[in-house]
Each structure stands twice: as C-alpha cells, then as structure tokens.
A protein has these predicted regions:
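Conserved AdoMet/S-adenosylmethionine-binding subsite of the radical SAM
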Residues: 1-114
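Generic hydrophobic secondary-structure packing signal
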Residues: 39-42, 128, 132
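Residues lining hydrophobic/aromatic ligand-binding pockets adjacent to catalytic sites
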Residues: 116-119
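Flexible loop/N-cap segments at domain edges
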Residues: 122, 127
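A cross-taxonomic marker for long C-terminal extensions/tails that follow the last structured domain
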Residues: 130-155
Length: 155
C-alpha cells in the first residue's frame, strides 16, 4: 500500500479490485524493515483512497470477486502490536465489512539473519496467529480470509 495518492487518483474509475498489503503500523519498524519513509501514513492514505474508489469487496453468485478492496496483512513475529493497530484502524476507519486476508506464511530468508534482525528471525507461533484472528473479531471484522492456516482455529 505504499502508493502515492496522485497515482491512485489517476487510476480512479479504471481499477475494479485493489489488494494492498498493510505491513507495519509502527514508524520505527517500517523504517527498520522496509527502509521507506512514512510507510504507515502513506499506507493509511492509500488504502482509504482505494476504498473510496471501489468500496467493500463484492462477489458474484459463483464467489468471484467483482469490485472492492481486499486488504492483506502478514502477521510478523514479535509484531502483534502492529497487527492489532492495523486491524483496529481497518475496522474503525473503513468499517467492519472490510475484507481482510490475515496471513501467517512469514518465513525469515534473505537479509533476515540472526545478527541483523534477530527479533523477526523465526516463523510466527500458532498463538500469535490465533491472537491476530481473535483480535480482528474483537474489533468487529468478520470478513476474514485465513483459510491457509495449517492449524485448527479453536472456534
């Protein structure tokens, strides 16, 4: 979701489905891991503009997406505070009908090493993922896609 408002405004009326990733809420983490300035604020503005243009995700009778926003969020190890703030913002600013894909497939690779980023040098735990899903429901989000999870969710 690190898109400029100018670019998004040029696409108004041309795009049917937006699928932005919202990675981090905390400015320090976004600078550390993404190395981009103002990521959280830019992402919030971009996602609000996408939502203004196409609204909530709508499907046809066969379950095929037709139009709307589907927000993706990758749960990261030791970053549940970010996950909670992002989910709270989605529910509050966009509404509980927003379709959210809460992803668990983070895998440390590449530049993520024990020395450089030890705090994210592991997969997320089942408990971290379950807390993310539970919090999404707690703030009123109900259109959740978490079908790829390999463990049973206890509700």
């Amino acid at each position: 979701a690190y898109d400029s408002l100018d670019a998004l405004e040029l696409m108004d009326g041309l795009v049917d489905i937006y699928m932005p990733d919202f990675k981090f809420w905390d400015e320090r983490k976004s600078k550390r891991y993404l190395r981009v300035p103002n990521y959280p604020e830019v992402a919030r503005q971009a996602i609000k503009e996408m939502h203004r243009q196409v609204g909530y995700l709508k499907f046809d009778e066969n379950g095929v997406a037709l139009r709307g926003v589907l927000i993706r969020h990758l749960v990261m190890p030791n970053c549940l505070d970010d996950t909670k703030e992002i989910l709270r913002w989605i529910a509050t600013e966009l509404g509980p009908d927003t379709y959210v894909n809460i992803m668990e497939q983070y895998y440390p690779a590449g530049l993520v090493s024990r020395d450089r980023y030890p705090e994210i040098n592991r997969r997320i735990t089942d408990e971290e993922y379950q807390q993310a899903i539970a919090f999404a429901r707690e703030v009123g989000l109900w259109r959740l896609d978490y079908r790829w999870r390999r463990v049973l969710i206890w509700w």
